[in-house]
């Protein structure tokens, strides 16, 4: 049998955060979800998460993963103490236990497969990952022979000056034979500078220990503070950009752009500087995004041009131009061949094919037909102080500049709305709707300053 245990009980004090370290985000996904994803194909018989600090928050974050089991570690007295909590849970378990850290988010499934393969061929009591670091400060040192057989692991705080010169470090990823480990766990001692129970102390007490040195040390990079979090974010973003550039996406200034792992792209896409994609996005062929554009949870068809704009939870069809400085809010659906210009905000609305909203307008809770021209400064006044009301604008309708449509209202097909009109009543098809106050001109008018002279 095969079990996995993820250590996720720590406070992460160096992160200076109000929520658990394992819930920090990288490219839109938490550290712990990244760790879980790295081993989801291993198909364990038991999948355990050891929680402690803000345990409820961690469990709530993972609530959709019903196959996980949770074990509380209170208080937190080190990695050895964490695994001790498994003794009653795995009392009758026979097999291998893979121990992972919830704050090591870049680990690849292929590396874990290599670890498992070496463990099986060596028949060792424990096989673990190691990394050779140029600056090993803070990491436990691994002392082994040329056959990768490990004599001991010494934590950094307990290393002598000579031992600190060793650059081979413990990556904290272990594969144990559980029937051997469970007999050693109760014997662990906290006689060390940290006064904690180290899981590494169990290794020297096991019959055989083997280490596997990783090819890429970035995979075992831990996240303990904001600087390390930023470093991991940069590594992920670089990997994502390189992947999509190999698939036909151009980044004008790659390092200024960020994308989520859920984002998908077609080909011949150009992404300008300072463009950011979050959540589940799909970008069709021949699109051009940016510069200075933010897109979240949105789907864009082919040949869409978005410049200096924000899109959130939108559906945009093909051959649409958006921006600069447009804001498309959730539940906005834009049909093909539309034009949305500068300083336009659209919320929870549908725009029919070929419709233009070129400048300085707010369209909210509206159904706008095909080939409609929304004049500059047109506003759909959708909120009456109690509820949001709907505006319907028919096909081939034109609204003049500075029009206000007070919802609920239905403007028919082929309607012309005169500039400066404020409409409160429905307008039938083929009509001219105009509502203005009478223009009043007073000739020879003098200002107050002129009158006082």
Swiss-Prot record:
Pathway in which this enzyme or protein is active: Nucleotide-sugar biosynthesis; UDP-N-acetyl-alpha-D-glucosamine biosynthesis; N-acetyl-alpha-D-glucosamine 1-phosphate from alpha-D-glucosamine 6-phosphate (route II): step 2/2; Nucleotide-sugar biosynthesis; UDP-N-acetyl-alpha-D-glucosamine biosynthesis; UDP-N-acetyl-alpha-D-glucosamine from N-acetyl-alpha-D-glucosamine 1-phosphate: step 1/1; Bacterial outer membrane biogenesis; LPS lipid A biosynthesis
Predominant location category: cytoplasm
Sequence positions that bind acetyl-CoA: 376, 419, 436
Pfam families cross-referenced by the UniProt entry: Hexapep (PF00132), NTP_transferase (PF00483)
Binding site for Mg(2+): 103, 224
Active-site residues from the entry: 359
Reactions catalysed, as given in the entry: alpha-D-glucosamine 1-phosphate + acetyl-CoA = N-acetyl-alpha-D-glucosamine 1-phosphate + CoA + H(+); N-acetyl-alpha-D-glucosamine 1-phosphate + UTP + H(+) = UDP-N-acetyl-alpha-D-glucosamine + diphosphate
Segments for region (Linker): 227-247
Residues where UDP-N-acetyl-alpha-D-glucosamine binds: 7-10, 21, 73, 78-79, 140, 155, 170, 224, 329, 347, 362, 373
GO molecular function, one term: UDP-N-acetylglucosamine diphosphorylase activity
Region (Pyrophosphorylase): 1-226
Family: In the N-terminal section; belongs to the N-acetylglucosamine-1-phosphate uridyltransferase family.
Protein name per its UniProtKB record: Bifunctional protein GlmU
Organism (species): Prochlorococcus marinus (strain MIT 9211)
């Amino acid at each position: 049998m095969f079990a996995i245990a993820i250590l996720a009980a720590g406070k992460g004090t160096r992160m200076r955060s109000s929520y658990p370290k394992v819930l920090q985000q990288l490219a839109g996904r938490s550290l712990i979800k990244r760790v879980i994803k790295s081993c989801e194909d291993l198909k364990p018989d038991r999948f355990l998460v050891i929680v402690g600090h803000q345990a409820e928050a961690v469990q709530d974050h993972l609530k959709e993963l019903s196959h996980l089991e949770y074990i509380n570690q209170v208080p937190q007295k080190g990695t050895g103490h964490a695994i001790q909590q498994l003794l009653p849970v795995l009392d009758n378990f026979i097999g291998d236990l893979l121990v992972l850290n919830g704050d090591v988010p870049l680990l690849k499934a292929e590396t874990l497969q290599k670890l498992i393969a070496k463990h099986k061929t060596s028949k060792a009591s424990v096989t673990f990952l190691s990394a050779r670091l140029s600056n090993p400060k803070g990491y436990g040192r691994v002392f082994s022979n040329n056959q990768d057989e490990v004599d001991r692991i010494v934590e950094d705080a307990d290393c002598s000056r000579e031992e600190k010169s060793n650059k081979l470090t413990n990556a904290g990823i272990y594969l144990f034979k559980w029937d051997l480990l469970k007999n050693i766990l109760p014997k662990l001692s906290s006689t060390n500078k940290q006064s904690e129970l180290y899981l590494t102390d169990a290794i020297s007490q096991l019959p055989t220990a083997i280490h596997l040195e990783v090819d890429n040390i970035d995979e075992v990079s831990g996240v303990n503070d904001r600087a390390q979090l930023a470093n991991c974010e940069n590594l992920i973003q670089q990997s994502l950009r390189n992947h999509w550039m190999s698939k036909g996406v151009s980044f004008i200034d790659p390092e200024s752009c960020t994308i989520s792992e859920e984002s998908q792209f077609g080909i011949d896409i150009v992404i300008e500087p300072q463009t950011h994609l979050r959540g589940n996005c799909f970008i069709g062929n021949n699109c051009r995004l940016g510069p200075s554009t933010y897109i979240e949870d949105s789907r864009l068809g082919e040949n869409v041009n978005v410049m200096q704009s924000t899109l959130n939870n939108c559906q945009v069809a093909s051959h649409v131009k958006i921006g600069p400085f447009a804001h498309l809010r959730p539940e906005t659906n834009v049909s093909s061949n539309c034009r949305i210009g500068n300083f336009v905000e659209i919320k929870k609305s549908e725009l029919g094919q070929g419709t233009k909203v070129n400048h300085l307008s707010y369209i909210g809770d509206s159904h706008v037909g095909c080939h409609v021209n929304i004049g500059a400064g047109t506003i759909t006044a959708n909120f009456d102080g109690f509820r949001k009301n709907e505006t319907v604008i028919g096909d081939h309708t034109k609204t003049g500049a500075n029009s206000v449509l007070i919802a609920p209202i239905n403007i028919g097909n082929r309607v012309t709305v005169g500039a400066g009109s404020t409409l409160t009543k429905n307008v039938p098809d083929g009509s001219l709707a105009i509502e203005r106050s009478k223009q009043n001109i007073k000739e020879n008018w003098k200002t107050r300053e002129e009158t006082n002279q």
